[in-house]
A protein has these predicted regions:
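Bacterial N-terminal signal peptides that target proteins for export
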Residues: 1-8
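C-terminal motif of bacterial Sec signal peptides marking the signal peptidase cleavage site
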Residues: 15-18
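Residues within mature, well-folded domains
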Residues: 20-111
Length: 111
């Protein structure tokens, strides 16, 4: 998870160096997601309907050995030369083997 964020952040910063305004990924409304999602109820089909296809898909394994499908959504935008205005947000969602949301975490822009 941390490696993915590092890779996305690095790609974002490299892209910012290539032109004056750069957008990476597809923007999403975190507040709208949080108001809709219900752990143990919401399905992959519903999440895809709200947010579209994930930017990345993988597998996470917890300390007890349980495996989860993990979907990642990210969005970044920035403008040179003032890098202080660059924004990056990442949402990672974990699903159980039945495709139901078990949990999620995000970084970047909050509510």
């Amino acid at each position: 998870m941390c490696k993915f964020r590092l890779v996305v952040s690095t790609l974002f910063l490299l892209a910012l160096g290539a032109c004056s305004t750069v957008q990476v990924g597809r923007d999403f409304d975190l507040s709208a997601f949080e108001s809709r999602v219900q752990r143990g109820v919401t399905t992959q089909v519903q999440v895809r309907g709200w947010l579209g296809a994930p930017a990345g898909m993988g597998v996470a394994v917890d300390t007890g050995g349980e495996r989860f499908d993990e979907w990642t959504y990210y969005y970044g935008v920035g403008q040179l030369p003032d890098m202080t205005d660059a924004r990056l947000k990442v949402l990672q969602i974990k699903f159980d083997r039945n495709g139901v949301v078990r949990g999620y975490d995000w970084s970047g822009e909050g509510k």
